[in-house]
Amino acid sequence: MKRSRLLLIIINYIYHDNIYLMSPIVDWNLLDVLNKNIRNNYKKIRPILLKWQENGYIKLIEDNEIAFSFILEKLPSKEKLIEESLNFK
């Protein structure tokens, strides 16, 4: 599965009904529910997640249970996050 498609799945989840306000934690089980290909292709999206972390949007945890958590105060608009993510080289 393409990196851009995987990222859009995650971004759409983040901003769906402001779900990030209910729980800023994204665990591996949730990623599996969103799309089974995310965990298998995690290496494809990890560089962008590292960029998100560098920008202060998320904190990568990457333990056995939790993939990452959002930093709500720093999270940009959905449109900005999509633009930054899809333009990442």
Give a label for each model feature.
Residues M1-M22:
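Short alpha-helical segments that sit at the start of domains
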Residues R3-L7, D27-L31, Y42-I45, K78-E79:
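Short amphipathic alpha-helical segments that mediate assembly, nucleic-acid/protein binding
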Residues Y20-L34:
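Short acidic, hydrophobic short linear motifs in intrinsically disordered regions
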Residues I38-E54:
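Short amphipathic alpha-helical interaction segments
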Residues Q53-D63:
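A short, conserved structural fragment
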Residues E65-E73:
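Minor-groove-contacting beta-hairpin "wing" of winged helix-turn-helix DNA-binding domains
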Residues E73-K89:
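Short, amphipathic alpha-helical interaction segments positioned at domain boundaries
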